[in-house]
Swiss-Prot record:
Cofactor: Mn(2+); Mg(2+); Co(2+); K(+)
Range of residues in the leader sequence: none
Protein name: S-adenosylmethionine synthase 4
Organism of this sequence: Populus trichocarpa (Western balsam poplar)
SUPFAM superfamilies: S-adenosylmethionine synthetase (SSF55973)
Any Gene Ontology biological process: S-adenosylmethionine biosynthetic process
Amino-acid positions noted as binding Mg(2+) in the UniProt annotation, renumbered to this chain: E9
Binding residues for L-methionine: E56, Q99, D246, K277
Domain of life: Eukaryota
Enzyme class: transferase
The gene coding this protein: METK4
Amino acid sequence: MDTFLFTSESVNEGHPDKLCDQVSDAILDACLAQDPESKVACETCSKTNMVMVFGEITTKANVDYEKIVRDTCRGIGFTSADVGLDADNCKVLVNIEQQSPDIAQGVHGHLTKKPEEIGAGDQGHMFGYATDETPELMPLTHVLATKLGAKLTEVRKNKTCPWLRPDGKTQVTVEYKNEGGAMVPIRVHTILISTQHDENVTNEQIAADLKEHVIKPVIPVQYLDDKTIFHLNPSGRFVIGGPHGDAGLTGRKIIIDTYGGWGAHGGGAFSGKDPTKVDRSGAYIVRQAAKSVVASGLARRCIVQVSYAIGVPEPLSVFVDTYKTGKIPDRDILELIKENFDFRPGMIAINLDLMRGGNSRYQKTAAYGHFGRDDPDFTWETVKLLKPNA
């Protein structure tokens, strides 16, 4: 049997880049909760004893940026300098300006345009992907790496493994076969976990606890065999972590946020951006389109691309490829997609309810992936049943 190996990685919520994504999206949530028309482009960076938020925000909301930063860091578990950041005593720097009036007039006419007239907030191209290899219609490598990261955080917060600290990374290699263009997982080849830990735990206990409390509950037993390779904290020491170990920045984990290296990526990040930014809303609508194609049984695997020009509502192009797994020709699937999905940014925001913030709606997306999540707030995961035209 001809097989190949493919690998995806993830980082958990205490990774410095992911900390920054969560702060940026927590600020977006706060703005949209009070003013759904908020225009937000919020970046965050962090290093030892410091978090800075900066960017362009035009909103009627009254937002306490410093409180949001501290609350978000505290919620992740950054409560002392020992673990990488002290939420209550670190420096918080804020440099927020209004959205450029040049952009405002071109995109939304200073809030005068109707939803169907709102232009894209920038140029760019976005991809959506779906595959039938998991119930989530997501790549197995990405699903397993992401779930390992989430489980690491769970057993840290519930004190199952009290030696754990917030920062951590995971990586999973799966052996696949190609079945006429569809991806069929055979076995897990390698599992890698590097997690921050306290001074006192031994490497032997780290390995034993990770196997028992993280790997065993997450990796389906049918994918493990006696040849599966485990690299558990292979560097031998990971005490210094979080922003103390590495600088963090919003938008540096775009593959972890999407499909783990499968499909394709247009390069635009998600976090801290309101729905007029097609980097986010465009990527959400093409995920819904690709997922709907696979869920409707029209293909086993699907990628959809959309592209935009700044200030122009209609997309410049829509593309679909089913990797030769389509039950009908790709050109017919493309027509179905165009008939069933409105790619204009203002209409995406309405149809996917993207102007609703608050209750950590966007902050939730900023750790453990934007796609394949079973959560009603992830409206783009809702399948539209697509039926071929007679």
